[in-house]
Amino acid sequence: ALVIAAHPGFPARDLGALLAAARARPGEIGYATSGNGTSPHAAGEMLWGRAGVRLSHVPYRGSAPALTDVIAGNVPVLIDNIVSALEHIRAGRLVALAAMTG
């Protein structure tokens, strides 16, 4: 399963609010993943396309650097494996917006 999570300073607290923000600011909101062509990247692009919004993909070379940059506030949103992000969500370093399965 994947999770869409955000830095605690990002105003969205659920997927609907993220999509509304993306509609208001097309292409201005970045989302980090573990790299181009990965499952999180593909899932994000499919979701944004179906929702009719545009977010800017920020690819990293693995999950750890993506998590680090979102926690630091350098990128506002992350799509990652829920196992990798769960500890940070529980600690309040990330806010879970939605889970993706299937």
Identify the role of each PLM range.
Residues 9, 36, 82-83, 101-102:
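Solvent-exposed coil/turn segments that connect beta secondary-structure elements
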